[in-house]
Structure formats: structure tokens, C-alpha cells
């Protein structure tokens, strides 16, 4: 009788032990997946930084266009005084927009690297790694954001030499570069999504060119939104670049940060949405 009782207790405890074992294995598996994802993310960042260190020509050549925007367009339009800028010199007014245009140019064409890696088979080998596609997309987007910030750091001293007066507040300047980093990472994720749709480099280049300039002109980068036609004003309100320009202009030029919370919220929402969409579509890149 006592033996049967002990056996029954053992039978009851056995499932509990098995459940605890399965639960521990599950937690261990999740921990390994998370660690793999973090390693993959940092591996992507390290890969891009190595590329940047070994080939800086691309960064310097892409800095030429924004420098021309400031040096030629900015100085000429400053003499015309045709655009109301709220008392801010015109070259100062457009500097945040030019910085963002140059960084977004880097980010939007980041997907071209993805297309090339797919064509050469490199991407397929990278995707064999156990890390999640979310880690891959976020890692690559962070790396692209770093490249974009390096691009902006080249243009920044040139703007100072051209007479642009920045707010002498290191916290504001660092926050402005954080905005550049966040919006650039978001556009890099958008570029990865586009790369999953466009199967050739030629198609990707065409769509990239068609994306950058309309976004640039349909924002407050060169002129206030109130100067736009009503239909274009609605587009500008939905344009994430508008909020990034407003944030950087307030932090670097005017010192007005009253809209910073709204601007940052809009940028973060944009980043979250495009990260999710890009991660979902990333596996289709190798199909």
C-alpha cells in the first residue's frame, strides 16, 4: 500500500519535473537566439565600418553635392531675400535640410549593396546564420546611420567656413546628430524593403532617384511649408523628412526646440514601421 502511494507521488512529480525541464530548455533556447541576434547585429555594423575605413572615396564624393547646395544655391538665394525664413539667414536656414538630404542619399542607396550581395550570392550565405532577420535589418540600418553621420561630419565644418552660425550648445548639436542617425537608419530600412522588391540594380537606382528629390522638395528643407500649394502641404505633413528638418533646424540654428517632442515621436514611429516592414520582407530578397 505504501509502495503504491510512493509510486503515485512519483508519477505526480514526474510531469512537474518534465515541465520544468522543458521550460528551462525553452528559456535557454530563447537566450541563445537573442545572443545570436545581438552578435549578428554587431557583425553587420563592424562589416560596414570596415568598408567605410577601407574605401572613404564614396563619402567624400557624395559630400560634393551638398557643399554645392550650400556654397552656390544658399549664397545666391540669400541675396534674393525672396523666401521668408523668420529672420534666419537663408544659408543657415537650408543647412539642416542639406545635411539631411546628403545623409538620406547615403541611406536610400544602401539597398544597392543588398541587391549586389544578392546577385553575387553573398547575401544567401549571410542569411544561413541563425540570427533573426530583425537583427540583420536593424544591424544594417544602424551601420548605414553611422555612415550617414560621418557624411554629415564632413559637411558640418564646410558649413562653418561658409558662415553658417550654429547654436553653441554641445547638447543641442549632439541631439541633432542623433536625429540624423535615427532618420538615416529609418531610410536605410526603407531601402532594404525596396531592395526586396527591385531585383536589379538598374531598377533600384531608378526608384532611388525618384524617391530622394520628391521627398526633399516636399519638405521644409528649402522653404517654409506655408509657401507650398495646399496639396503639397498635406504631403509635407506626412513626410518624415519634414520632422527631421524641423528638429535639426531647431537644435542647430534657431534654438527653438518647442516641437522637438513631436518631431522625435514622428521619426521614431517612422523607424518602427519601416523596420517592421523591412524585416518582414527581408527573406524575400533571396527568392
Question: What name fits each language-model region?
Answer:
Residues 29-65:
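Aromatic- and glycine-rich beta-strand/loop motifs that create alpha-glucan
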Residues 31, 54-57, 103-108, 139-140, ...:
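Short alpha-helical transmembrane interface motifs in multi-pass membrane proteins
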Residues 43, 47-51, 121-128, 196-199, ...:
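Short amphipathic alpha-helical coupling elements at transmembrane boundaries
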Residues 51, 82-86, 216-273:
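Membrane-interfacial helix-loop-helix junctions in multi-pass membrane proteins
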Residues 68-75, 90-162, 182-183, 187, ...:
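Hydrophobic alpha-helical transmembrane segments of multi-pass membrane transport proteins
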Residues 73-82, 159-171, 198-200, 223-228, ...:
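Short helix-capping/hinge motifs at transmembrane helix termini and TM-loop junctions
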Residues 133, 137-208, 213, 255-279:
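Alpha-helical transmembrane segments and their short interhelical loops
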Residues 280-287:
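Short cytosolic juxtamembrane segments of multi-pass membrane proteins
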